[in-house]
Amino acid sequence: MDKFLEVIWSPEALRQKELIENTRSQDQFDMYFSKIILLIENIKQNPFKGLGKPELLKYEIPPCWSRRINKKDRLVYRIHKRDIHIISILGHYND
């Protein structure tokens, strides 16, 4: 059983998901989102190590982490109790 109970998407991350879905082909969206799902599953196993080169973001309170989706985009998330909060899935954390 996974250590984490729930994945909670921020309104911004949901907006970004919709933007990606509406501006890319279905194949591109499927490939992009399958990478996000893979990263989330890896976060459930170990939130601070693993795929996507996890990096603690400096100066963020509460602490946030990022993982590489691709060369340009990062999955930014934070852990709160047993929940994974997805903050952003498009661009870098400081874009």
Model regions: which residues?
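Compact soluble domain cores
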Residues: 30-47, 51
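Enriched for short, Lys/Arg-rich terminal
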Residues: 1-6, 18-30, 51, 57-58, ...
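Short amphipathic alpha-helical interface segments enriched in basic and hydrophobic/aromatic residues
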Residues: 17-18, 44
